[in-house]
């Protein structure tokens, strides 16, 4: 059985599916050289008492269209204080708030000027918290690429000697399977199903930041992500 590669753009406080894809792969490629566009790269949601609460890292206008790894965080927006305050209020009664203290310190008590570095530190820390050991490769470390879209994915797989590309379900509308087939790369779909687990506040919301899972499930978060079982 050949090497299975998953590829994903950097996200801020990613949802559990990001890490589910990672754990299913032999190698995880962090797609940090592609263009920054506002969205999951610089924002995500947690669950507050009133419902979903969005956390957005402000990014300078001149960063749009440039590589994610070079995107600059807008200074003077006081986003770190606001994010930490929102999180601590939302999870004041969470059983595992203390477990996330180091993560909050990393994100909100360091001076971040670059979104790429912030996301890399955030996502690596979360990976360790979940007990995932899949090795990472930064796409920016693989040399220059002229390809885009599915051709880019195929070229990354080729450079890594991958036999299989593990695709997230969200790319079904734009991924071209024929490009991978011509390149001799098997296409495998992730088939992700959001895990169910006890949450604070009324009702259940899925596809929040994985921070919600960690706050509520603690050390069991990795098991829940892996098995799909409830806490």
Give a label for each model feature.
Residues 1-231:
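Residues lining hydrophobic/aromatic ligand-binding pockets adjacent to catalytic sites
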